[in-house]
Amino acid sequence: MSKSNESAVAFQTAIASIKLIQASSVLDLTEDDFDFLTRDRVWIATDRSRARRAIEACVYGTLDFVGYPRFPAPVEFISAVIAYYVHPVNIQTACLIMEGAEFTENIVNGVERPVKASELFAFTLLVRAGNKDLIGHAETNIREQLRAQGVM
């Protein structure tokens, strides 16, 4: 598969991930954690563990909710979560915190090649750049879902 085809497949996987995130009504987040994730204040070193927990709650919320074990999420899904939930001021930090994931194609083919934070960041930027319509109203959509669940 050519490099451009690989990129297109990865991008389409990220688009599908965003649609999956939008369809999911299960987030293992409190209102405070959601505000922490989406606010425009820069995360500092002491925020690292809270930031990781909040991002992982978005990635694994449904599995955690029903009590199933977690399995490694692919880069496309993690980048979609970061693009969808994390305020732009913290995207680089989120990518650093979540580095080590692998692309879907590598998981399927049994190839181990964890991505670096810089690669996750670049892919997250591609996801944000190509999906302004899907990402633009994320905070409003999620707040409505949290209110419907009685969390907010």
From Swiss-Prot:
One of its GO terms (biological process) is viral procapsid maturation. Its main location: host cell. The keyword Transmembrane helix does not apply. GO terms for cellular component: host cell cytoplasm. It comes from the Viruses. Keywords: Host cytoplasm, Viral capsid assembly, Viral release from host cell. Pfam families: gpD. Disulfide bonds: none annotated. It is found in: Host cytoplasm. The keyword ATP-binding does not apply. Belongs to the microvirus D protein family. Component of the procapsid particle composed of 60 copies of the internally located B, 240 copies of the external scaffolding protein D, 60 copies of each of the viral structural proteins F and G, and 12 copies of protein H. Assembles the procapsid by joining twelve 12S pre-assembly complex into a T=1 icosahedral particle, called 108S procapsid. Ten proteins D bind each 12S complex, which are formed by three pentamers of F, G, B protein and a H protein. The scaffolding protein is released from the provirion after genome packaging to form the mature virion. This is External scaffolding protein D. It comes from Escherichia phage G4. The lineage of its organism: Viruses, Monodnaviria, Sangervirae, Phixviricota, Malgrandaviricetes. The gene is D.
